[in-house]
């Protein structure tokens, strides 16, 4: 029996993780759930999965939940301290980090220090603190298994000897606005940007997919997860989202992992590795399908170029890029900035940052904090 703490249980990845638990009650058990402030949803989860602890970031929401589940034997905690409580208890074996944003960095670090393995769906953790997180995992002998479909695909295609690896190829749908003119992009609304052609995801990652910043974050994540140089990480536009990523070896062979665009597949693999469990999910049927691939250089994706540049520069710059992007995306969703202003804001903040070595958590968090304040200043100016 594997016991789980699920961070972000009310979000897209979190609810799909619970679907895996629901279908495998003999193998998986929920120890703790954590979310932001969605009291109604997490109460339903509490009554179904009977966790021992629930953490909510918002204290008011935690107080309300405590009253709602008073009939259940559940400890309700709040804030970052409460979040850390859910990952450091001795009971859980694996922590699923499915919360969105840089806020996942601290609980991931504490979970590793507490001897937990990580099923990582929070790419911002590695973007902001990749060297620190991967170094901690290696030093403590803990495993970080990718949940992102692209990184799960790469992980499944890897051979034992890393010296045979030539490069990895991340695929991207290209989002809903591939090929649109600047005039068309000026008219993009949050509602239109939230309509992803293939995947059902949360709001922030859906906007990132539209701008291609999501793929940029994934390039940096792949650099850390697989210890690859940036010139060994390629991106291909693949609108059908059937091939989730590919690995090219030194002899020219290319291995690809294919599947339907269903996040439950990489989630389940991260929870069951190194074994595979049967499931009732719809199977991939390639009959009658045409798969196509395009060079992202054929389109104007400034976010992808910016992410490569920030990743190569390293230090605190990726954390700053990520923080500025989080603020800019949420401002767009709140109709405070236009769609085309998102990446311009991020680029401006990155250009103003004095890069430091990202050797400790405090330095990373300080850079993140500065970037958020500066981005807000630019939005208000």
Curated annotation (Swiss-Prot):
Alphabetized UniProt keyword annotations: Isoprene biosynthesis, Manganese, Metal-binding, NADP, Oxidoreductase
EC class name: oxidoreductase
Required co-factors: Mg(2+); Mn(2+)
EC number(s) recorded for this UniProt protein: 1.1.1.267
Chain sites annotated for binding 1-deoxy-D-xylulose 5-phosphate: 123, 149-150, 173, 196, 209, 214-215, 218
Catalyzed reactions per annotation: 2-C-methyl-D-erythritol 4-phosphate + NADP(+) = 1-deoxy-D-xylulose 5-phosphate + NADPH + H(+)
Molecular-function GO terms, alphabetical: 1-deoxy-D-xylulose-5-phosphate reductoisomerase activity; manganese ion binding; NADPH binding
GO BP terms: isopentenyl diphosphate biosynthetic process, methylerythritol 4-phosphate pathway involved in terpenoid biosynthetic process
Pathways per UniProt: Isoprenoid biosynthesis; isopentenyl diphosphate biosynthesis via DXP pathway; isopentenyl diphosphate from 1-deoxy-D-xylulose 5-phosphate: step 1/6
Tree of life domain: Bacteria
InterPro entries assigned: DXP_reductoisomerase, DXP_reductoisomerase_C, DXP_reductoisomerase_N, DXPR_C, DXPR_C_sf, NAD(P)-bd_dom_sf
Binding site for NADPH: 10-13, 36-38, 122, 124, 202
Ligand binding (Mn(2+)): 148, 150, 218
NCBIfam families: Dxr, PRK12464.1
Function: Catalyzes the NADPH-dependent rearrangement and reduction of 1-deoxy-D-xylulose-5-phosphate (DXP) to 2-C-methyl-D-erythritol 4-phosphate (MEP).
Protein family according to the UniProt entry: Belongs to the DXR family.
Record's protein name: 1-deoxy-D-xylulose 5-phosphate reductoisomerase
Organism: Desulfitobacterium hafniense (strain DSM 10664 / DCB-2)
Organism lineage: Bacteria, Bacillati, Bacillota, Clostridia, Eubacteriales
Gene name, Swiss-Prot/TrEMBL: dxr
């Amino acid at each position: 029996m594997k016991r789980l703490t699920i961070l972000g249980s009310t979000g897209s990845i979190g609810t799909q993780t619970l679907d895996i638990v629901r279908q495998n009650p003999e193998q998986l058990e929920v120890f703790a759930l954590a979310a932001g402030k969605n009291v109604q949803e997490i109460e339903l989860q509490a009554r179904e999965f009977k966790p021992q602890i629930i953490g909510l970031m918002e204290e008011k929401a935690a107080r309300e939940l405590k009253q709602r589940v008073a009939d259940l034997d559940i400890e309700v905690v709040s804030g970052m301290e409460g979040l850390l409580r859910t990952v450091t208890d001795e009971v859980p074996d694996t922590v699923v980090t499915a919360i969105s944003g840089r806020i996942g960095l601290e609980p991931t670090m504490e979970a590793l220090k507490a001897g937990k393995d990580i099923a990582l769906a929070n790419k911002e953790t590695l973007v902001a603190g990749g060297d620190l997180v991967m170094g901690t995992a290696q030093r403590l002998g803990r495993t970080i298994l990718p949940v992102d479909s692209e990184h799960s695909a790469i992980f499944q295609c890897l051979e034992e000897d890393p010296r045979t690896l030539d490069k990895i190829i991340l695929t991207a749908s290209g989002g809903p606005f591939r090929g649109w003119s600047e005039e068309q992009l000026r008219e993009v609304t949050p509602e239109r940007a939230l309509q992803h052609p293939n995947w059902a995801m949360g709001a922030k990652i859906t906007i990132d997919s539209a701008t291609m910043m999501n793929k940029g974050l994934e390039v940096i994540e792949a650099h850390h997860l697989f210890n690859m140089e940036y010139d060994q990480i390629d991106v291909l536009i693949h609108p059908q989202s059937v091939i989730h990523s590919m690995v090219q070896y030194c002899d020219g062979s290319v291995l690809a992992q294919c599947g339907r665009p269903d996040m439950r597949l990489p989630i389940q693999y991260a929870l069951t590795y190194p074994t595979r469990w049967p499931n009732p999910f719809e199977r991939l049927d390639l009959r009658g399908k045409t798969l196509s691939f395009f060079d992202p250089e054929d389109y104007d994706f400034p976010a992808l170029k910016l992410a490569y540049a920030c990743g190569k520069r390293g230090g605190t710059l990726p954390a700053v890029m990520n923080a500025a992007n989080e603020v800019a995306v949420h401002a767009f969703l709140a109709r405070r900035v236009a769609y085309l202003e998102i990446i311009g804001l991020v680029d401006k903040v990155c250009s103003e940052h004095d890069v430091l070595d990202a050797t400790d958590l405090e330095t990373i968090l300080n850079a993140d904090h500065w970037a958020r304040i500066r981005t807000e200043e630019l939005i208000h100016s």
